[in-house]
Design a protein with these regions (language model features):
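Secondary-structure capping and boundary motifs in well-ordered enzyme cores
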Residues: 42, 69, 124-127
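Short, thiol/selenol-centered motifs that function as redox-active sites or metal-ligating centers
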Residues: 65-71
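Alpha-helical macromolecular-interaction surfaces
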Residues: 71-72, 91
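Alpha-helical support elements that line or immediately flank enzyme active sites
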Residues: 73-85
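Structured beta-strand/loop patches that form or line metal/cofactor-binding pockets in enzymes
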Residues: 20-60, 64
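A generic structural signal for alpha-helix starts
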Residues: 68, 84-87
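A generic structural motif
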Residues: 64, 82-83, 135
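C-terminal binding/interaction regions
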Residues: 1-24, 86-147
Length: 147
């Protein structure tokens, strides 16, 4: 892996989200839904908390530790999914997972992913796919438990 490829993965937007993650809470709220997921490959741990009220995701936040990619992706995930309906959140999550696997997604879905669309670059770095998708899988797991 060349240095040019690494700079493609660790672009300015990713580094900004990792350095100052949005919706990061040292102490997660105890009400609502919570889940913790681990990525043993990289050592990432993500704790996600959210409330579902009237079919919408509210108070979406996270904490945890891990690599730059996992922390940046979790930050982007909270920006993207917060306030969305559960149906829209599921579509965005699936679109994000497809993007990270190198599968094509619609321009509309890519636009809906906001900053998170830059994470599509992890498709070229298979070892980083789990890092990028961990927080998204956490919310997906919570939503699937609600069905």
């Amino acid at each position: 892996m060349g240095l040019a490829n690494l700079s493609f993965l660790y672009n300015t937007l990713v580094l900004e989200h990792a350095k100052s993650p949005h919706h990061y809470e040292a102490n997660l709220p105890t009400n609502g839904h919570q889940i913790t997921l681990h990525n043993p490959t990289c050592g990432d741990t993500i704790n996600v908390s959210l409330q579902i009220k009237d079919g919408y995701l509210n108070d979406l936040c996270f904490n945890g530790s891990g690599c730059t990619i996992s922390q940046a992706s979790a930050s982007m995930m909270t920006d993207t999914l917060g306030g969305k309906s559960t149906d829209d959140a599921q579509k965005l999550i699936q679109g994000f997972l497809n993007l990270c696997m190198g599968k094509p997604i619609s321009d509309e879905l890519k636009q809906g992913l906001q900053d998170a669309a830059v994470m599509g670059t992890v498709a070229e770095f298979p070892a980083r796919i789990k890092c990028a998708t961990l927080a998204w899988h956490a919310v997906q797991d919570i939503l699937n438990q609600q069905k």
